[in-house]
Amino acid sequence: MTSILTNNSAMAALSTLRSISSSMEDTQSRISSGLRVGSASDNAAYWSIATTMRSDNQALSAVQDALGLGAAKVDTAYSGMESAIEVVKEIKAKLVAATEDGVDKAKIQEEITQLKDQLTSIAEAASFSGENWLQADLSGGPVTKSVVGGFVRDSSGAVSVKKVDYSLNTDTVLFDTTGNTGILDKVYNVSQASVTLPVNVNGTTSEYTVGAYNVDDLIDASATFDGDYANVGAGALAGDYVKVQGSWVKAVDVAATGQEVVYDDGTTKWGVDTTVTGAPATNVAAPASIATIDITIAAQAGNLDALIAGVDEALTDMTSAAASLGSISSRIDLQSDFVNKLSDSIDSGVGRLVDADMNEESTRLKALQTQQQLAIQALSIANSDSQNVLSLFR
């Protein structure tokens, strides 16, 4: 039926045109934004996941920046420790040179003093962004330094920041700013050489292990010698010594003990001191810390071997600290690479969820444009029906 009040054909054509126009708007929006899911109304589940992951990716970007800052701190500390190790090696070499007979210890001490000043400069300069890992206040115990290492969201949705910790303690800092517990300002304990000797007491021979000294130790301590007997008047090695089986050991007056006499100077009968004071010590304090080395002082000059052993102990701790810093630096580099890859993976995953396929969208737009033209043509034809009715009355 043809009606001049209701044009069903035009209404159908108009509805189709509106639908096509709406689809074109959606397609053009996806093309202009590049997103298939641009809002929660497009796909609530995908939009929620994408929004959360984008937030996490921003946090990872901050982690990446923090890792760069942490790497700079660690690298600064490592470089300082590495330089300090080389300086301490030089100090050790100077001390070894000082053991030679006839050397000018005062001149060697001048060089050592310059090297000690260099160590102080290295420790003070090894600072980045206001943090120094080579010197610290250890009065309250070890100090923990942390570097941000990661951002984690667990299966329950809870988030946390992971950190890489490094302890500043007596074995890792060069100087304790409030005490003497750093590697360079503490006195190390060193092991003393020993010798096991048979000692006859009242006809019974027993084995005793006692501290052993070489003749150079005694000479450096300004000892006076009388055959197999020596006396050191003052300093760290002050006391009496006798030579037994090629080793110099602490001596004791044994006139009333029944012990075998090793040396008789006509006044005193000397034997091996088998008491605690004559036993070998495994925790003998070195004469000085590296920071207080002064071989012009008799107590240090007379015990250079122990001083060198103390420096060697310090080098061991410094090497260990440098190794720890190196391992942390390597870990930070690995973590940085991982964070970069993780960030790329998140970007890729979010893209799969919400990005528009531009090839598909452009093809769809072309089809919709064609449909729109056809719908406009159909609407035009439908609207012309009323004109055809009018012509019947002419």
From Swiss-Prot:
The record's InterPro entries line, in alphabetical order, gives:
Flagellin, Flagellin_C, Flagellin_N
Which keywords accompany this UniProt record?
Bacterial flagellum, Secreted
The record's subcellular locations are: Secreted; Bacterial flagellum
What would be one Gene Ontology cellular-component term for the protein?
extracellular region
Residue ranges annotated as coiled coil are none
Task: Show the GO MF annotations.
Answer: structural molecule activity
Instruction: Name the principal localization, coarsely classed.
Output: secreted
- Domain of life, per UniProt, equals Bacteria
SUPFAM superfamilies for the chain: Phase 1 flagellin
Write out the function statement from the record. Flagellin is the subunit protein which polymerizes to form the filaments of bacterial flagella. Homomer of FlaA is able to form a functional filament.
The UniProt entry's sequence similarity note says: Belongs to the bacterial flagellin family.
Q: What is this protein called?
A: Flagellin A
The source organism is Rhizobium meliloti (strain 1021)
Q: Give the gene that encodes this protein.
A: flaA
